[in-house]
Structures are given as C-alpha cells and as structure tokens.
C-alpha cells in the first residue's frame, strides 16, 4: 500500500491535506485497493455545512459501497467534478483524485487524525 507522506489519515482510510484553513479530502490507497474498481462517486454540494464524522460522500465499486466521512467540521468550498464522469480516477491515483475541499470551522479536530508514519505502521 502506498502512503503519501505529509498527509493526515482517518481511521476509515481517508487522507487529508491541510493548506491553511482548508483541507482536501480523498480516499487512501488502502481503501481504494480494498474497494476495487470504483464505478460511482456521490459528491457533496458546494456550500454544504458538515460536522466531523458526518457522511461526506459515497463511493461505489464493483465489490461494495463505502462512505467517506468528514474528517473536520466546516463548509464545502470545492468538489472534484472530474469524479462525476471519471470515478475510476481514484483507482489510478487516489492521492491526485481528491473528493472535496472543506474550509474548517474547528481546526482543533485535526488532532484526531493520524500522521503518515503512524498510519503506515497501522496497516
């Protein structure tokens, strides 16, 4: 499994990239590998407010369906619309095929996430 350095990770195998007060969220390699070929992604709506732990997006594969939960609370400021037409981009490069960006309302919630080294050791 590939673990991208410099990112944070959730217990549900999602990755989080922090850039100022905005986080980018995507599906980690472990999750996409276990799901198999991804055929559909239900994206959140821009301007939606989310709470940490809320369902953010749904990913469906030939094997199963899985939710991506919000790693932090805040407002959706951007979604990766490419995934509407090309959900398999997550399988090609899950760290480039991000799902959405959230403007954080409570950055302290980042402390609940795992750094890359600890995440890799847990796999």
Describe every region a protein language model picked out:
Residues 16-18, 62, 79:
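Residue-level recognition of beta-strand microenvironments
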Residues 22, 73-75:
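Structural motif
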Residues 29-31, 61-63, 72:
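Short glycine-rich, polar/acidic loop-and-turn segments at beta strand-coil junctions
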Residues 44-45, 50, 62, 71, ...:
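Surface-exposed strand-loop junctions at beta-sheet edges and helix termini
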Residues 58-69, 86-88:
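Short, Lys/Arg- and Gly-enriched loop/turn segments at beta-strand edges
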Residues 76-92:
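Short, charge-rich, low-complexity interaction segments located
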